[in-house]
Curated annotation (Swiss-Prot):
A GO MF term: structural constituent of ribosome
Subunit-structure text: Part of the 50S ribosomal subunit. Contacts protein L29, and trigger factor when it is bound to the ribosome.
An individual GO BP term: translation
PANTHER family: 60S RIBOSOMAL PROTEIN L23A
GO CC terms of this entry: ribonucleoprotein complex; ribosome
Function field: One of the early assembly proteins it binds 23S rRNA. One of the proteins that surrounds the polypeptide exit tunnel on the outside of the ribosome. Forms the main docking site for trigger factor binding to the ribosome.
Name the record gives this protein: Large ribosomal subunit protein uL23
InterPro entries the record matches: Nucleotide-bd_a/b_plait_sf, Ribosomal_uL23-like, Ribosomal_uL23/eL15/eS24_sf, Ribosomal_uL23_CS
Keywords: Ribonucleoprotein, Ribosomal protein, RNA-binding, rRNA-binding
Domain of life: Bacteria
Similarity section: Belongs to the universal ribosomal protein uL23 family.
Length: 100
């Protein structure tokens, strides 16, 4: 784990991503999260294991380039987004949707 997130692992994971592709990946025990763009794989693994009390088997990350956005005559850039697909060990699950 890098020194950047030693004392605040909760800052590594921003939110779970709920898309059609991410929802279908839940069947293979893979969860998709938006993470801090400076986070490395050991940071993400430590954060998921500590916050959700599960065992992580593998992590895939993607850091796509920022895209330009235009509103009227003004142009800008979208926020930097890094996604992580976390594969859990068999028998481990993360409760993303609360039971009612």
């Amino acid at each position: 784990m890098t020194e950047r997130f030693n004392d605040r692992l909760a800052d590594v994971i921003r939110r779970p991503l709920i898309t059609e592709k991410a929802t279908s990946a839940l069947e293979q025990n893979q969860y998709t999260f938006e993470v801090d763009h400076r986070a490395a794989k050991p940071d993400i693994k430590a954060a998921v294991e500590q916050l959700f009390d599960v065992r992580v088997v593998g992590i895939s990350t993607m850091n796509p380039p920022r895209r330009s956005r235009r509103v009227g005559r003004f142009t800008g850039k979208r926020a930097q987004v890094k996604k992580a697909i976390v594969r859990l060990a068999e028998g481990n699950t993360i409760q993303l949707f609360p039971e009612s």
